[in-house]
Amino acid sequence: MKIIFIGDIVGKQARETLIKKIPDIKSKYVSDVIIANAENSAAGYGLTKKIAVQLLESGVDVITLGNHAWDQKEMLSYIEECPKIVRALNYPEGVPGKGFYELELNDGRKIIIVQVMLRLFMESARTTKNAHLS
């Protein structure tokens, strides 16, 4: 199984470049799945619905988030509509979205993508438990 993970798309230029290149990357490396961390794709402040749709339509299979998950308030509802967007698994109960996604590949195999947020020089997932409410 070939998995391509694209780490931290930051801002418009990186996002637009990736969207253009994804089809070539997918065919060149004959990948089974492409996972992209897009928590900084909206100018370094989270992810928007529009950007998520663009990434998924370009060929990204699953999007992961991080500590900027709630910077764009529209994600509070959209993350419930789009299970291919994965927030931290270790957020407390009641936080919108899920921390994992089970993806069935074209050949019937399944892969589970899990996102866990740890901390180093930043707030813990526990102290940000109500960030989605502010």
Per-range role (PLM):
Residues 1-134:
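Acidic, metal/ion-coordinating pockets
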